[in-house]
Each structure stands twice: as C-alpha cells, then as structure tokens.
Amino acid sequence: MGRLPGSRSAPSPWGRILIVITVLGVVSGALSVTIMFWLWRLNILEALVKDAKEGRWPSALIGTVVLATSFLLEGVWVGDYFIVPSAAMIFWYAGYTIWHWNFCVLNFTRPLALFHIAVLAAPWLFVAVTQDFGPWMMERGNSFTFAGCLHITFEGWINQRLKYDAFAQKSAFLERRSTQLLILAAVSLLCLAAWFAQG
C-alpha cells in the first residue's frame, strides 16, 4: 500500500514493513490485517481528494464508492501472508481495478497510464495461475509498491519507451464526462454486486 504510484514522494514502505514484523511475531495477524486495510483506505481517500481538488467530480465519486464499499473487506492472516476468503470480493476487486486505472488515465501521462495496465493486471494474472482469489489484495500490495518504485525511478524512460500516439488518441474518450459517468455506474454496480454476493 502507500502513496499512489506517480506521486513525487517515494511509495510508503509501511505495508511491507508491517508484513515483515507480523511474520516475525511482533504484532498479531488480526491487527496487521486491520492496519493494512486502513492504509488501503487512506490511499483511496488521498486519490479521491486529489480528483476533487482538480474538479474531476465523477472520478472523485467513483473513488468514494470504492472507499465506502471497502468496508466489506475481511481479511485473515494465514502463515506468512493474509487472504480475503470471500470469493464475492472478486466484484470489488474488479471495481477497484477500473477505478484505479481511470485515476491513472486522468492524472498521469498516457505512457504511464499504459504502464499501469501491466501493474494492475499483475494480481489478476497471479489469481488466474493459482485459481485462488484469496491473496489478491496481498499481490496487489506487492505490485503497487514495486510499480511505484519503478514509476518514480524510471518515469522519464517509461514516458519515452511507452509513447504510442494511437493509444493516446484512442484513450482520450475516457476523459469525457459521459464516459466518466458510465465508469461510475459500472464501478457502483460491481461494488454493489460484491455487497449482495457477500450476503
């Protein structure tokens, strides 16, 4: 977890440090999971506040939906990592992924937004291979931290190497208000689906 990739300050190491000290038995697994979820929520809050300050109200509303429904998350510490055992949360993960990439498109250059497609796909590839959605959030935290370091360290290189005019032109429609409202509707439905499926 930590700061959003692309912020000028380095990604926060607290999520990774928390995992290490939990594995070492310094803090309990239950407390660690609770703290990590709150770090996650603070990160989402930071993003939606940024969108609100920039006047991107549809995107800020999307972030608000994701933040509000994040309280559905319930984690369990297992061995040396944590899982979210409810399969229903796949809907929330999908909504979160859409929201986060939308944030990237609106706040970063097009090459960096393209880079974050791979970053956001990483935890999905993990669960596709393992057929287990439980560790999705753990893997998202790992990819988030690693990508944040790459983003900040190699931002210039990424902007040069991933510059594709075709992608820039085709993705421009995402900034339209009508598109943002459609994304708001889609993310809201996914998050509500997680709520209903969880029962």
Label every PLM stretch briefly.
Residues 1-56, 145, 160-199:
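N-terminal topogenic module of multi-pass integral membrane proteins
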Residues 31-146:
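Generic multipass alpha-helical transmembrane bundles of integral membrane proteins
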Residues 128-131, 158, 162:
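Membrane-interacting alpha-helical segments
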